[in-house]
């Protein structure tokens, strides 16, 4: 999930600037993405309460995966801001629901180890997405393949989440009390 989100977040301003949008518009799209992200975190928390954290994580991951592929194709100013807002909600929802998912599915006795592993792979994913966006841009001269790569990484994440979900069987959600 982190590869998908980081590529979009890091490359939205240069991509929009390269496509002829003013720097103010490009920065405004990033600001919109981040500000709506605040609502995404709160929204994901509420959705976790309703359908469970792993399902919410999958839903938000699916949202960011479907939305990320559209960034290089949107031409209108309204479309850019709408896509930035929807993606911001989804990507922040991924982050919030992933935290809750780990806390719910991991036994407390191994929580520190689990969080170390999750954090390690999250940071690797963040770096990979940012780097690959630039690498693919340099290789192809455009952002279409970079954002397609982000969507492919989102699909891999969804496959992993689906396998994890079905491998757990029908378990009842566990309340985590701090």
Where are these regions (language model features)?
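Helix-to-loop junctions at the C-terminal end of transmembrane segments
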Residues: 40-52, 137-138
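Intracellular juxtamembrane helix-capping segments at the cytosolic ends
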Residues: 93-106
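C-terminal ends and interior cores of transmembrane alpha-helices
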Residues: 63-75
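Paired small-residue
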Residues: 67, 78-86
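Symmetry-related core transmembrane helices of the 12-TM Major Facilitator Superfamily/SLC fold
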Residues: 145-164
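A late C-terminal transmembrane helix in Major Facilitator Superfamily
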Residues: 105-142, 150
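Extracytoplasmic gate region of multi-pass secondary transporters
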Residues: 1-44, 129
């Amino acid at each position: 999930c982190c590869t998908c989100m980081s590529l979009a977040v890091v490359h939205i301003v240069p991509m929009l600037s390269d496509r002829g949008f003013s720097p103010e518009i490009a920065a405004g799209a990033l600001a919109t993405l981040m500000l709506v992200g605040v609502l995404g975190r709160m929204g994901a928390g509420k959705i976790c309460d309703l359908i469970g954290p792993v399902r919410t994580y999958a839903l938000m991951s699916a949202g960011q995966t479907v939305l990320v592929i559209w960034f290089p194709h949107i031409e209108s100013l309204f479309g850019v801001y709408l896509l930035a807002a929807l993606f911001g909600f989804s990507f922040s929802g991924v982050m919030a629901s992933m935290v809750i998912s780990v806390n719910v599915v991991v036994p407390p006795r191994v929580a520190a180890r689990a969080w170390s592993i999750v954090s390690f792979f999250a940071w690797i994913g963040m770096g990979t997405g940012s780097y690959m966006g630039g690498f693919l841009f340099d290789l192809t001269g455009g952002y279409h393949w970079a954002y397609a790569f982000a969507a492919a990484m989102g699909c891999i994440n969804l496959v992993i989440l689906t396998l994890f979900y079905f491998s757990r069987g029908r378990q009842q959600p566990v309340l985590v009390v701090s």
